Amino acid sequence: MLNEAIKEVLSGKDLSESQSEQVMENIMNGQESSALIAGFLIALKMKGESIPEITGCAKAMRNMAVPVKLKSQYAIDTCGTGGDGGRTFNISTAAAIIAASAGVKVAKHGNRAVSSQSGSADVLKELGININLEKSKVEHCIDNVGMGFLFAPSYHSAMKNVAGIRRDLGVRTIFNILGPLTNPAFVKGQVMGVYDRKLLEPAAKTLLNLGCERAMVVHGGDGLDEITTTTVTYVCEVKDGEIRKYTLSPGDFGIKTTFYKNIAGGTARENAAIIMDILKGKTGPERDIVVLNSAAAIYIGKKAEDLKEGILRANELIDSGKAYAKYEEILNYNN
């Protein structure tokens, strides 16, 4: 089947959603050779992944994931595609903790570093969080504490069939896009960063196809898969079954534009130290970018009416010590 799919894609045709779902199912089940999988991934990348292709592949991966069952009716994720080459510290991970302190239920889906020095799993481990917590405890932690970490390899075991191929190819493929779209808790809210502005609308439409209620799909004008503070950010917002496009600027919220070097990260240990400083109230550009991304998570988590209120809440939670207290609560539950 993959042979035929490659021929179609090479001729410039888009695969249907059902074709894409079947192809991804075969890949995940180990039914296709490494050479064919690599050929398919590169052919798809060269053509450009269509919305039906992304949706079908995401559905296959979601169907094969170990499901996380929450009592909470509404939970969110703060997860980007990565692959932006930005090498910032783990902004969305810090934002997840602050959003949880606002009362948002956060099912943080993530992995170890692929192209950066520190993935969400790496930095959470440095922060003392058990990234291999058993599923029932993660479910309880999200429902009762407010945030739990879903370590991707534990919930998408079939990914082992493509891990080596992705590593050998060394280029971004559809799997970069699929990571944030395949949260095993099937969250209804999402702040999703993408590495390419062209992916904003396809990602937003795919989220709608997958039943997402609220989302902000974001891409920084500097290339970051976050809401940035160095320049404008492009946004596709999903709300009430519709997609709205707009741009954000740090100045819109009274935040000073900064230089990239001021939000750069390092090793997992260095990034954990930056996050700890922010949670303890340190001010500066690193806090500014975390507050802006936390505001988005609080807004998508339905705990603020808009981003401006989200920023006020994020700052209050940090300054009052509630954000750090939430981190300690998560830490204590995980150990």
Curated annotation (Swiss-Prot):
Pathway(s) served: Amino-acid biosynthesis; L-tryptophan biosynthesis; L-tryptophan from chorismate: step 2/5
Record GO cellular component, one term: cytosol
Binding residue positions for anthranilate 1: 80, 111
What's a single GO MF annotation on this record? Answer: anthranilate phosphoribosyltransferase activity
InterPro entries associated with the record: Anthranilate_Pribosyl_Tfrase, Glycosyl_Trfase_fam3, Glycosyl_Trfase_fam3_N_dom, Glycosyl_Trfase_fam3_N_dom_sf, Nuc_phospho_transferase
Indicate yes or no for the key word Lipid metabolism.
no
According to the record, how does the cofactor bind?
Binds 2 magnesium ions per monomer.
Q: Which domain of life is it from?
A: Bacteria
- Which annotated residues bind Mg(2+) 1? 92, 226
Q: Where does Mg(2+) 2 bind?
A: 225-226
GO BP terms: namely: L-tryptophan biosynthetic process
What residues does 5-phospho-alpha-D-ribose 1-diphosphate bind to? Answer: 80, 83-84, 88, 90-93, 108-116, 120
> What does the UniProt keyword field contain?
Amino-acid biosynthesis, Aromatic amino acid biosynthesis, Glycosyltransferase, Magnesium, Metal-binding, Transferase, Tryptophan biosynthesis
- Asked whether the keyword Methyltransferase is assigned, the reply is no
Residues given in the record as anthranilate 2 binding sites: 166
Q: What EC numbers are recorded for this enzyme?
A: 2.4.2.18
- Which cofactor is essential here? Mg(2+)
What does the record give as the reaction this protein catalyses?
A: N-(5-phospho-beta-D-ribosyl)anthranilate + diphosphate = 5-phospho-alpha-D-ribose 1-diphosphate + anthranilate
* Biological role stated in the UniProt entry: Catalyzes the transfer of the phosphoribosyl group of 5-phosphorylribose-1-pyrophosphate (PRPP) to anthranilate to yield N-(5'-phosphoribosyl)-anthranilate (PRA).
Q: Which family does it belong to?
A: Belongs to the anthranilate phosphoribosyltransferase family.
Give the HAMAP family listed for this entry.
TrpD (MF_00211)
> Assembly state and interactors?
Homodimer.
Q: What is this protein called?
A: Anthranilate phosphoribosyltransferase
What organism does this protein naturally occur in?
Clostridium kluyveri (strain ATCC 8527 / DSM 555 / NBRC 12016 / NCIMB 10680 / K1)
The coding gene here is trpD
